[in-house]
Amino acid sequence: MPSLDFKRSDRVSDLIHSEVAKIFSTEVRDPRLAGITIIRVEMTPDMKKTFIYYSSSNSFSDVDKKDLLIGLSKVKGFIRSTLSKRLNMRRTPEINFKEDTSVFEE
């Protein structure tokens, strides 16, 4: 039987991706974050930090983008505490949001 070479951080990233997508679609009520799609989640090997890559279906001006970033920073704590309740992990990783620009590079 061939061994599957998956790192634990990859499996946890997939789980966090699924949960964060659910949280954004059902629990986040901030209108600044409407149209956000979670593209992928990456974790550091020590699993202390997670990077959540997002894209938005809305086209933003600089002012709107600033509001989006403010909304994301305000929802970080809520997402982390919700993940802490749902996932059986010793420590819930620090959350960092990054815009996924690869969607626009085509």
Predicted regions and their residues:
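Charge-rich, low-complexity N-terminal segments
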Residues: M1-K49, S55-E106
